[in-house]
Amino acid sequence: MVDSYDDAFDGEKSKTQIKRELHALVELGERLTTLKADTLARLPLTDELRKALDEASRHTAHGARKRHMSFVGKLMRVQDLDAIHAVLEQIDSSSRQYNERFHGLERWRDRLIDGNDEDLERFVNEFPDTDRQHLRSLIRHAQHEKARNKPPAAARKVFKYIRDLDETQRGLR
């Protein structure tokens, strides 16, 4: 029996696969244009690509931007994509961790304002550097604001105090 499958085509990519890969490079280039300058500095990019990414913000017309992003995609072909993806994953991971910590602090604030002395005791156990008197005062003000349906200025102060304690405990301050 003769097999019609030809082994010569195993290594070649189809036109569709090539287009998918190029489109993925353009999308990665689009993502890079949204990053801040200090974040871009951490990425292993060529000077030509850095210049093209900087110029991308100047192209506002749809056609010009699309054409320029195709150029960025072309420049992306010679980049170390694994290194770029690794740095972007690290950035995403640290951003996720920051957001999770931020939401945890918001939950603490809400429990302290809505809660009782048990919640305050748990908080003080977790954050031993807490100035109880100051925190109780902030909580009391926030509770009064909440009862009177006023804007949450005191609740913001409670959050800021909690965030400062957290940053001090983590050595970020």
Swiss-Prot record:
Gene3D superfamilies the record matches: PSPTO4464-like domains (1.10.60.30)
MF (Gene Ontology): ribosome binding; rRNA binding
GO CC terms: cytosol
GO biological process, one term: assembly of large subunit precursor of preribosome
NCBIfam families: PRK05255.1-1
Entry function: Member of a network of 50S ribosomal subunit biogenesis factors which assembles along the 30S-50S interface, preventing incorrect 23S rRNA structures from forming. Promotes peptidyl transferase center (PTC) maturation.
Name the record gives this protein: Dual-action ribosomal maturation protein DarP
Source organism: Pseudomonas entomophila (strain L48)
